[in-house]
């Protein structure tokens, strides 16, 4: 209403990108590329994010160092360091630094951790004893796909471009399907909307991890504040690369 009234009450808005789409198409936002005093080439702006949302030379929102939300929303992988030690596994920090943290490397850890422990299946039971390799949220596989350097749609030459369907894309999908098997407890999909609770046997992915029943878990930085009370040590690593030939690790954000 304020924008339509033209009263210029607000100069800047902070809102999720998905909430801005309607305002952008309605013409309510100014193209930042037309504002010479907004120096988007300076290092305090996050070019990797901003270039991904710029279309046909127009940019209606931008992220920079002043936006703490993008840090809180960055997705990482948490691991149970105590469980890893009990399994006789080395924490993967050196593997990450050496550029060898790949889906194959992760699979070694998941296979070592997965254990039904006498349960009749890998299906979640609140009083069960199954240990899972990885606790995944309902959108977790997409983050692994992006960690492999793949996207379904990308901005190329200023236009949205469908980038799925390449041989490498399908190779990544195939490998992910083999890594995150659920029948053997290497992975569990925990879709509960309340990440940290177990309602009627329907667990949130954070709950599976914090209850000590998963070696790894999808997580965003903001969740780590609640990890201070855990009764085990934990560590964090980026999403793995597809293979060692991939140049960089990649972790997205909620809006990524």
Feature roles, as predicted:
Residues 1-17:
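Early extracytoplasmic/lumenal segment of secretory-pathway proteins
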Residues 11-14, 210, 215-219:
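Paired acidic/hydrophobic, glycine-rich loop segments that form the ligand-binding mouth/hinge
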Residues 57, 227-256:
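Extracytoplasmic/periplasmic substrate-recognition and gating elements
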Residues 13, 55-75, 85, 99-161:
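Extracytoplasmic/periplasmic solute-binding protein
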Residues 33-45, 96-98, 124, 151-171, ...:
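Short, solvent-exposed loop/beta-turn-alpha elements that line the ligand-binding surface or hinge
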Residues 78-81, 254-256:
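A bilobed periplasmic-binding-protein/Venus flytrap-type ligand-binding module shared by bacterial periplasmic
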Residues 107-110, 142-198:
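Glycine-centered hinge/linker elements that transmit conformational signals in sensory
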Residues 15-74, 104:
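Hinge/lid segment of periplasmic solute-binding proteins
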